[in-house]
């Protein structure tokens, strides 16, 4: 049985309204027109140089989306980082650090408090071992990263398609199975900015793809991670011979928790209970006694917050596997930006301005 989420009724109605052009979407449409004017005005002010857009001396790859409510970009960020690391490149990651309670610029370390850095940056750092910095202004994070890790050759920005204060060289826009929803701007639809717009690469993690772009498969790893980094085969948790000796309780504090539960069941796991929590839930009110009779299994993003409270919880990584053509295009575009000289220092003239 799935616990109800703590999302309010109006948020649920709004999310449903974003899938089609019903009465609620049309009711909110005039506000969307005003929002669209403000979005265009803001971009124009950057293009005119009234608002400052700054460049850093290494290529910047922005991975983001144009829809509200999450489209699975963080697993794509980690996939891109690992791919670049496999090429032998020194990669750094920057992020705003959504949900953190601090406002300064800081490095994400293995012992950083989630409230100080945010759950997604903590997950990226733990999963990839790349240096990660968070700041309200991405350019501040990028500069701090380069000052601390001078050999960095590429910066990957987690989210930030709409953060025009940092110039970028490549933009990857991620879509899930919702595509652009009803095609309206906020609040009548899910779009943060008008679509289509120029980006370098479009990656669809949903099936079937909503429109032209590259495709990627989302699957769960065949193993679960423990807090100490050791692995437990998911097959050992499946069926009546489950080695955990306790019923499984699956929990997820992500945009679409039911997708996680469905994927676990597809791996043969029997879930005695499921617990759907709001995205970025902080576990501040978590009570161990309420769940002590269960083996807890969760997403990687939840685990970085849950492990201090439940060190025996299991985390199942989400694996994003893009079609080979996507990585080929990414490499080809990036190779044009990287210097032939092995030195990581680049001229400020590299790349292009996307604002």
Curated annotation (Swiss-Prot):
From the UniProt record, give the pathway where this protein acts. Glycolipid biosynthesis; lipid IV(A) biosynthesis; lipid IV(A) from (3R)-3-hydroxytetradecanoyl-[acyl-carrier-protein] and UDP-N-acetyl-alpha-D-glucosamine: step 6/6
What reactions does this protein catalyze?
Answer: a lipid A disaccharide + ATP = a lipid IVA + ADP + H(+)
Q: SUPFAM superfamilies, from UniProt?
A: P-loop containing nucleoside triphosphate hydrolases (SSF52540)
EC number(s) on file: 2.7.1.130
Q: Which organism is the protein's source?
A: Albidiferax ferrireducens (strain ATCC BAA-621 / DSM 15236 / T118) (Rhodoferax ferrireducens)
**Which enzyme class, named as a word?**
transferase
Q: Which residues bind ATP?
A: 67-74
Give the family from UniProt: Belongs to the LpxK family.
Task: Spell out the protein name for this chain.
Answer: Tetraacyldisaccharide 4'-kinase
> What GO molecular function annotation could you give as one example from this UniProt entry?
tetraacyldisaccharide 4'-kinase activity
Tell me which GO cellular component terms the UniProt record holds.
plasma membrane
Q: Which UniProt keywords apply?
A: ATP-binding, Kinase, Lipid A biosynthesis, Lipid biosynthesis, Lipid metabolism, Nucleotide-binding, Transferase
One matching Pfam family: LpxK
Q: Give GO BP annotations, semicolon-separated.
A: lipid A biosynthetic process; lipopolysaccharide core region biosynthetic process
Keyword flag RNA-binding: no
Give a short account of what the protein does: Transfers the gamma-phosphate of ATP to the 4'-position of a tetraacyldisaccharide 1-phosphate intermediate (termed DS-1-P) to form tetraacyldisaccharide 1,4'-bis-phosphate (lipid IVA).
